[in-house]
Amino acid sequence: MHKLFTYLCSALLLVTATSCEKKTEKLLLGGSGWNKIVIIDKNTKQVEWEHPLEKGWECNSAVATPDGNILFAYARGAKLIDRNHQEIWNIAAPDTCEMQTARVLPDGNYLLGWVGHPAVIMEVSPKGEILSRTEYETGIEHPHAQFRQQNKNARGNYLMPLFATSDVREISPRGEVVKITRLEGTPFTTLALANGNHWVACGDGHSLMEVNLDNGEVARRYGENDIKGARLFFVAGLLPAKDGGLYVCNWQGHDKNAVEANSPQVFEINDKGEVIWNLNDNERFGMISTISTIE
């Protein structure tokens, strides 16, 4: 009986210990100027999967889909691939345009967007079926100076951050301007918050700000040297982290001396703006402008 009791206690302890182990978070990373997209273990910072990109495939949007596939924009189009690198579908952009946006929407469909004349926003099913298409003329002559990551807001409109005009435009599905919010720098992406505000990554403005896009009021702003341990360069992709924190992609391609600053390529801040995790390894990782969690 004593042996049986000891065995049962040991088994219970093993189950308890196993159940208490934290599941390791995985991050999908990519970036303009980097020749691959990768999945890393957040804790070890080791690359566990990588997919090569051809020369000229500028990737500013890469995201994991709910079923574990990888959706990414690569300037010439957008692809959905599986973890075995098999292409599920590919939607090409016209020769004079650049596909820059590839996002997963809350309803499970995807948001794609290319810059050009006009710029085009599409909602696409997981099977690659184009469900809707919105055209909008930005008025910005050079397509590359238009947008990178667009998002869809709770009103069902599209948020288009524009480089050349330093603003975020809310565009209806019919291609009509609903609202223009003037900001600073070269806005790269937006991220909705529970309070109705949005984080806006301001690119070459070397800044990150929380903004009410309805009235333009800035609730918080971090400038180039405001975050201890992370000098801001081109502030790019954003991702919500646990406990109200935020992942920030700190793309360094516009400053030839960026490596000397020893500032992380991507980092996580808590709700107080303190760095609690970072990735700073220019030998193993390229310039990072997009981030996603992945199972």
Regions found by a protein language model. Name each.
Residues 8, 12-24:
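Bacterial Sec-dependent signal peptides at the C-terminal "C-region" and cleavage site
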Residues 23-295:
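Histidine-/acidic-rich catalytic cores in large beta-rich domains
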Residues 1-8:
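Bacterial N-terminal signal peptides that target proteins for export
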